[in-house]
Design a protein with these regions (language model features):
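Basic, polyanion-binding surface patches
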Residues: 1-149
Length: 149
C-alpha cells in the first residue's frame, strides 16, 4: 500500500499514470545510502526525462512483471495492482506482492533485519523516519493470554 500525490499542477504524476496503465508496479525499499538518489527521482521531471538516469540509478529486469526494479535497492517487491482509491489529491494503490528480491547479505535462515535499515516517508513533502530504533518482544500465545485474563 502506498500513495502518489498529484504534481504541482494538480495532475497525476507519471508514476500514477504508469501504474494505472500497466496494472503493476515495484516497491523499492530505500536505505540511507540511496536517500539522495531517491530524493532526486521524486522531482517532477517531464515525462521524457528518466528519473532513474537523472538520479544515477540503474534498472534491473523484474521476474514476474514487466516493470523494472532499481538495481541498487536491497529489497524490491514486484506487485500487481489490486485496487486504487482516490483520496483528494492522492491516489492510494494497493498491490499484491508477486515476487520479492532481497540482497544476499540480508538472507539466511531468516531475514537479517539488523543488516537492513530502510527509510520511511511519514507524509508531507519532506518528513521521513529511520527504522533503527528497534526492539524484540516474544509473541504471546493464546494459552498464555487466556491464563492471564
Amino acid at each position: 500500500i502506498f500513495s502518489v500525490a498529484n504534481n504541482e499542477l494538480g495532475q497525476p504524476k507519471d508514476t500514477a499514470n504508469n501504474i494505472q496503465a500497466s496494472g503493476e508496479f515495484v516497491v523499492n525499499m530505500v536505505t540511507e545510502e540511496l536517500f539522495n538518489a531517491m530524493n532526486i527521482s521524486a522531482a517532477d521531471f517531464p515525462a521524457e526525462v528518466g528519473e532513474l538516469e537523472a538520479a544515477g540509478l540503474h534498472a534491473a529486469p523484474s521476474v514476474r512483471i514487466k516493470t523494472p526494479r532499481v538495481t541498487e535497492a536491497h529489497v524490491s517487491l514486484e506487485c500487481t495492482l489490486f485496487s486504487t482509491q482516490q483520496l483528494g489529491a492522492n491516489t492510494l494503490f494497493v498491490g499484491e506482492v508477486v515476487m520479492f528480491h532481497v540482497a544476499d547479505h540480508l538472507v539466511g535462515p531468516r531475514l537479517h533485519i539488523n543488516n537492513f535499515s530502510p527509510i520511511g516517508r511519514l507524509g508531507s513533502p519532506s518528513v521521513y523516519c529511520r527504522t533503527t530504533d528497534r526492539f524484540d518482544i516474544a509473541r504471546i500465545s493464546y494459552a498464555q493470554w487466556k491464563q492471564s485474563n
